[in-house]
Amino acid sequence: MAKITAQLVKELRERTGAGVMDAKKALVEVDGDMDKAVQYLRDKGMAKAAKKADRVAAEGLTGVYVDGNVAAITEVNSETDFVSSNDKFVNLVNAATKTIAEGKPANMEAAEELKMADGTTLAQSFVDATATIGEKIVLRRFALEEKTDDQEFGAYQHNGGQIGVITVLEGADAATAKHLAMHIAAMSPKVISPEELDDDFITDQLAVMNHKIDQDNESRALVNKKPLPYLVYGSEKQLSDEILAKAKEDIKAELKEEGKPEKIWDKIIPGKMQRFIDDNTQVDKQFAVLSQNYIMDDSKTVGEFLKEKGAKLVAFQRYEVGEGIEKKQEDFAAEVREQMK
């Protein structure tokens, strides 16, 4: 039987990331054959990963990697936020994001077949990480953006990688592209312009906003405050020429009733019309980045800011760890009872 030396154990640990006892046991099982020991640990890791497959992994990190005219963004999930500060986990996120940027896979299946720097497939790297770290580790999603030489990438990660953003801008410098990425990280838009918002989505969001107004009005009634009006429209897509014309006529009628001289109406109407538009484009302001007030200068919208710069937002990607995943609610008392059986 081969002698299992400390050097052999160290080498196997460096190749696989396994713990000391697991590495030593693997070498004993295969009589000191390094390649067989690596495979033994991988097989063991796949078994561990299979046992963890039904666990909810909703924590983790985003990864952002930019190289020349290609940028990649990923979300890698773990079961607990404690793991997100683990060096092995962080290194895996960075390496996987770089591999995806370089390989430019068309879908998740193609991404999983990409080879990492050590020759391991991306899929196997996540199996190995699950075994080594002891939690379910998964690549949940990724996106690629490409630009031309005269365009600019902006990249930003917030809160230690909990949010990641990539922007592609035309006619802008790197600083503007990054500042817009920071805006998107903070304001969570879903689309670039209101035209991209689905009609059913607008209707649903209006219902949500009016429900909130209902709740606010209940509170206002308790202190004898005037109730807030309900929103009729939510997007500029809904504000047809006819609707805007009627709003203008309503404003004129209001000014006439208030006794305002007709000669000053032209000075008052534009401001009131803008207020009408602002009040009736709340869905745009929440979800379309060009309609949002720019966080670096809230006196103007992002669209107005970019127009002043002669710039155009071509594309963006925003990932937030765990968004859309239903997290498991832990019952620690039940868990302890189960362990005591």
Curated annotation (Swiss-Prot):
SUPFAM superfamilies: Elongation factor Ts (EF-Ts), dimerisation domain, UBA-like
Keywords: Cytoplasm, Elongation factor, Protein biosynthesis
Keyword Cytoplasm: yes
Places the protein is found: Cytoplasm
Family: Belongs to the EF-Ts family.
GO MF annotations, alphabetized: translation elongation factor activity
Pfam families: EF_TS
Region (Involved in Mg(2+) ion dislocation from EF-Tu) location: 80-83
Gene3D superfamilies per UniProt: 1.10.286.20, DNA helicase RuvA subunit, C-terminal domain (1.10.8.10), Elongation factor Ts, dimerisation domain (3.30.479.20)
HAMAP family: EF_Ts
The organism of origin for this protein: Lactobacillus gasseri (strain ATCC 33323 / DSM 20243 / BCRC 14619 / CIP 102991 / JCM 1131 / KCTC 3163 / NCIMB 11718 / NCTC 13722 / AM63)
Name of this protein: Elongation factor Ts
GO cellular-component term (any): cytoplasm
Major place of residence: cytoplasm
Keyword Protein biosynthesis among record annotations: yes
Function: Associates with the EF-Tu.GDP complex and induces the exchange of GDP to GTP. It remains bound to the aminoacyl-tRNA.EF-Tu.GTP complex up to the GTP hydrolysis stage on the ribosome.
